[in-house]
Amino acid sequence: GLWQKIKDKASELVSGIVEGVK
């Protein structure tokens, strides 16, 4: 559902931030 899409987007954002910090 919608919540799953939001969680997926949040995970993508977190992964992007983590990669940027490395």
From Swiss-Prot:
Antibacterial peptide with narrow spectrum of activity. Inhibits the formation of NO by neuronal nitric oxide synthase. GO terms for cellular component: extracellular region. The modification Lysine amide is found at K22. Signal peptide: none annotated. Keywords: Amidation, Amphibian defense peptide, Antibiotic, Antimicrobial, Secreted. It comes from Litoria rothii. It is found in: Secreted. This is Caerin-3.1. GO terms for biological process: defense response to Gram-negative bacterium; defense response to Gram-positive bacterium; negative regulation of nitric-oxide synthase activity. Belongs to the frog skin active peptide (FSAP) family. Caerin subfamily. Expressed by the skin dorsal glands.
